[in-house]
Amino acid sequence: RQFRHLLADPAVTERYRVLAFDMPWHGKSTPPDGWERTEYRLTTASYTAAVRAFCKAMELDRPVVMGCSIGGRIVLNLAIEHAAEFRALIALEAADFQQPWYDTTWLHRPDVHGGEVCAALISGLIAPQSPVVSRHETLWMYMQGGPGVFKGDLYFYRVDGDLREKVKSIDTRICPLYLLTGEYDFSCTAEDTLRTAAQIPGVEVQVMKELGHFPMSENPAKFLEYILPVLAKIS
């Protein structure tokens, strides 16, 4: 749903085929059978496998993959491990690693409303210029998350998905890579993205003005100013 505005915008869909899917445990996708006997933890391997399985099931021929936040991190891993499978890769709000700045134990406790605390955690990452309606739509998506899912996602983001010392192996001659980060993002800061980009010869990087951690949902119109030129360059 975070990409729904791009999916509904003729400026995008008249030229490009756009597919977005809910990961298992997220949105309208259910957890795997037997989920009640396990603790959900997203890993680099399982996330990478899910993206590649979707592309295979849809019979996509070297698609362009774009992801944001943890989705941006997995895009970097796709560039590291599977670059030849893609026409281009776009990582939004992405870096090889971010130092944790919050306590994830608060995200799954019986005495705390999980959805509301998740939304509270990320609310400050939205740029002040973002429309009020779009801001609260973005927060609502986090309020609707299943118990422990955001905490499990952050296991990948904070622990398992550490790509330091790995991104320097990315070869943009095989697959072009674009990094775009909002200036108001203090989770993945512009400095984090620029530090990562400095290790990747040939990468194209841009800091997006008046945007935060969720550009495609917090201010879709502003995001189009940045993403449409990238798509045009790829096409």
Which residue ranges define each predicted feature?
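The serine-hydrolase catalytic nucleophile loop
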Residues: 1-7
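Flexible "cap/lid" loop of the alpha/beta hydrolase fold
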Residues: 76-117
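Conserved alpha/beta-hydrolase catalytic His-Asp/Glu region
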Residues: 100-101, 114-172
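Conserved alpha/beta-hydrolase "acid-adjacent" motif
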Residues: 186-192
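Catalytic active-site module of serine/aspartate enzymes centered on a nucleophile-bearing elbow/loop
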Residues: 203-235
